[in-house]
Each structure stands twice: as C-alpha cells, then as structure tokens.
Amino acid sequence: MIANATANRKIAHLVEFAGFSLTAISDFSKYFKALQANIENYIIAIAVKDTPGLCFTDALYADMQRIGVTVNLTKKHWYGYAAIIDGGKLLAEDAAYQKVISVKATTEDGVAVVATSKPLKVGNATAISFNGIGRSVSRRGINITVYDKTKKCVCDSVCFDTHVKSIDCHR
C-alpha cells in the first residue's frame, strides 16, 4: 500500500508540474501515438532491462517507429537496446545480444542524455539520465523517459513489460 501511495504521489507530481497527459496512458500503442503527436517538444530516451521480451511483436515495432526507432526488437530475446530521440530525430541507437548497451548524446538545446541497457545476465538494469539526473523505472521490458523541451523537465518515466502478453505498464 505504501508503494502505491508513493507511486501515486510521483505521478501526481509529474502531472502537476509538467502538465502532460502522458502519465495517464498505460497502453503501449496509445503511448507511442501520444509521443508522436507532440514529438517536436520531446527528448525521448529508451533502455531495455532484462529482455525486450517474448511478446514483443512487429506491431509494437511499428508503434516505436512512429518516434524514430529503427531497430526491430521482435525475436530479440535477451538483447540490450538503448536509443535517444530528439524531436523525432534519432540521435543514438544500439542493440546487441547479451551485451551492455550505452548510448550518449547532447541535443541541440544542450541537454546531455545517457541511456544504458543491461540484459538479464549482464547486470539486469537500466539507467536513463538527462543532464546527470537519473530517471528510469528500471523494470523488465521497454523503459522510456520523456523530457519536455518547453518545460525543461522530465514529464514521464514508464516501463512496458513486453515479456508478458498483457504488456503491463509500470511507473
């Protein structure tokens, strides 16, 4: 119960201070559609923890392509993956089987972004930071942190567990 209360306060804080509805979306496809709708205002960092999952599909990849992702994680069980996207422009992206992946970029606005992915057997973690401040849910699956360039702050941090058919959403 305490964990839920803490999570609810965190979400309320993000909504109150960033003013965005991303935090209300828990469906994978709808989330990427919402990102695409306001892509010019977002810096998006993605990192996989554990595995992209056995339930990652070509349809989910098509959703991710909306924001500039070019690596298809379908059938990439145990792969590390990380990407940084600024305003729809892919700044960095990498993937490899059972390898720690870390990508870094500085945006045109001067925001330093780092995204690190560690599959299960090589660390089982993620780390995403904007200007040195870490923000990652760090749960199994696709971890996404979104920075709003107009507000100059993180407006959402979410994980979609693509290893289960229900594609559970965690914040």
Language model region names:
Residues 1-171:
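Short acidic-hydrophobic catalytic motif
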